[in-house]
Amino acid sequence: MFCDYLIQILTARVYDVAQETPLEYAPNLSARLNNQLLLKREDMQSVFSFKLRGAYNKMVQLPPDILAKGVIAASAGNHAQGVALAAQRLGTKAIIVMPVTTPQVKVDAVRMRGGAVVLHGNTYDDAYSYARELEVEKGLTFIHPFDDPHVIAGQGTIGMEILRQYQQPIHAIFVAIGGGGLISGIGAYVKRLRPEIKIIGVEPVDADAMSQSLKAGHRVRLSQVGLFADGVAVREVGEETFRLCQQYVDEIILVGTDHTCAAIKDVFEDTRSILEPAGALAIAAAKAYAEREQIEGQTLIAVACGANMNFDRLRFVAERAELGERREAIFAVTIPEQRGSIRQFCECIGNRNLTEFNYRIADEKTAHIFVGVQIQNRADAVKMVETFEAHGFETLDLTDDELTKLHLRHMVGGHSPLAHNELLYRFEFPERPGALMKFVTSMSPDWNISLFHYRNNGADYGRIVVGIQVPPHEMQDWQAFLDHLGYRYWDENKNPAYKLFLG
């Protein structure tokens, strides 16, 4: 099978629709990493991602009579545009089943390329199941987004281009993993010709289906999947892609949301282009790898695999990028409620730039300060904590606390003497009409909402934090509500920031 993929990649038909994208030097990132970082700019394709390669290579090889009947696909994003463009170029019809939660900009992009959009279900799994039903009902050919040899071979042409474009030593190639089609194709080609090059996969920490599968030795289906990097939000990897990754992937690096946002900013500073979160994963991993391995003078290649970014997500990315780069730290500091305390606190900060400063009296003796400070590195933040505490100011470092970053820094208020039996939970729910109403109406009318915060980040999924007063004897009913709701949730009742500012 190894040689079969080599031949399939060498003979893949992708250049009717795809361009050979440049392999660009990233000067700022390279200087910071003390290594040469090259970006494979798949974000420069006409559909702003690599997906048209595999889709076209699959469809162009269908028998004419089969192709004439049309194709169908399920996708919430880049694969949909690739299939629509390929169908348009080949003169056939394409039906794309997309979840009803799909942002309008992506629906419009598919329609602009001639695809007939069918909105069905709330998740990719719902859309996939319905697409397979329509496949049989209408006699169409299903174009899988990753688990198909022709799709894998089409994506593998990226590996072929990389080795042709850069013939000097390469330490590692970093590739984002969703279902695994991209890294399988690149790995199958590169490892055949240059086996010394490391193939390193990248997944979000909350969408790590391939990482878990490789550790388990079999495919693992995730019960929940994070959606910030929606282009790789896959619950279960492909059967063929899993087999290929077992053979060709050297390791998988997991990256968090903040580091992904920082990578988006890094690429913007080097190229003035904005990648989508999935498109920036490889860059985030290359940075983490270089720091972990303490390497210098090596050539690292990161596949910038997509740029279908919703504009209204940029606010969230900008806020979290500084945290991902360790250029901002967030602290909760308790100071004495007396004259001169704030001045003494500010003297501890010195000449550092503040990103925010919130002060609230807590009681007769103490007050709480929520402060964001620009820092040079993580060691700088540790030093600040030591300085605060040396002056007798009790300090919490909240830089890595999700509740703080998503909600508390945007909230006002304080402790309420009326919030008896309050429970605090974070929820993630689809951004669709009626989703919030479902949440509220599903609760018992006997439960009082004592705290609520929602902020639209321009993503397919929204995030809320809710304080709900539930009597102790109704805790079993509360757990049943959580289980029935079907949304991801996090228990934040023991969160120190909540206890300090709101609990």
Predicted regions and their residues:
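PLP-dependent amino-acid enzyme catalytic core
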Residues: 1-435, 439-503
